[in-house]
Amino acid sequence: MSVPLILTILAGAATFIGAFLGVLGQKPSNRLLAFSLGFAAGIMLLISLMEMLPAALAAEGMSPVLGYGMFIFGLLGYFGLDRMLPHAHPQDLMQKSVQPLPKSIKRTAILLTLGISLHNFPEGIATFVTASSNLELGFGIALAVALHNIPEGLAVAGPVYAATGSKRTAILWAGISGLAEILGGVLAWLILGSMISPVVMAAIMAAVAGIMVALSVDELMPLAKEIDPNNNPSYGVLCGMSVMGFSLVLLQTAGIG
């Protein structure tokens, strides 16, 4: 099994961490969840804009028009899919001040699971493609994806457990969204494999960079602010950028990057 595929599987499996937290009743503080989402956004933004897009543009045979065009395509593609998907977000379930009826919770959780699954599928592809092109960047993307998968698993498992009283059912529903990400990585592994030219890989990387930027500014940062409105998610973003940037410098200094 390839290392990029293993990274994708581990990132998707992080959903189960949130699921177990949801059924065990040990919910992390909103401040910690918000910081982790901002941290993940910072990692994604720095890797996308400072590493992935420049690397794609520098690839042999890649034209600036194609490179920037694929980046814009990734941005617009994300926003297009976001408008088409069911608009239930983790904060819709994590911040209920009045406890809804069990059936209402279950229905909302199912819609949320569907939306997150469709949203996670291309993330699995993105993680695999990035790690296949550059393993160093793949580690960073996998870490960022794993960090924001934890509150997603928590957001689904908690309400389903409240509605059904079954820990197994709650973990199952939460795990579906994580499995969708793993499925995306497996399909990318089966379809792409080694039969892809450097230009095509660079074009895909540019599109993935656009998707990651859109995900960070449209989903992760607003979600962090909604989960913890009393604190600025920018602190998490800055920390994520700083840690990722410092680690990249260390790797490059050591001759690994």
Swiss-Prot record:
Membrane-crossing residue ranges in chain numbering: 5-25, 33-53, 61-81, 109-129, 137-157, 171-191, 195-215, 236-256
InterPro entries: ZIP (IPR003689), Zn_transptr_ZupT (IPR023498)
Annotated consequence of substituting E152A: Binds Zn(2+) and Cd(2+) but with a 10-fold lower affinity. Retains binding of Fe(2+) at the high affinity M2 site, but loses Fe(2+) at the M1 site. Strong decrease in Zn(2+) uptake, but slight increase in Fe(2+) uptake
Effect of H119R: Mediates some residual Zn(2+) and Cd(2+) transport activity, with no transport of Co(2+), Fe(2+) or Mn(2+)
Effect of E152D: Impaired in overall metal uptake. Cannot transport Zn(2+) and Mn(2+)
Pfam families the UniProt entry points to: Zip (PF02535)
Highest taxon, organism lineage: Bacteria
Effect of pH on activity: Optimum pH is near neutral pH.
Domain statement: Contains an asymmetric binuclear metal center in the transmembrane domain: one metal-binding site, M1, binds zinc, cadmium, and iron, while the other, M2, binds iron only and with higher affinity than M1. Zinc is transported from M1, while iron is transported from M2. Iron transport from M2 does not inhibit the zinc transport activity but slightly stimulates it.
Protein name (Swiss-Prot/TrEMBL): Zinc transporter ZupT
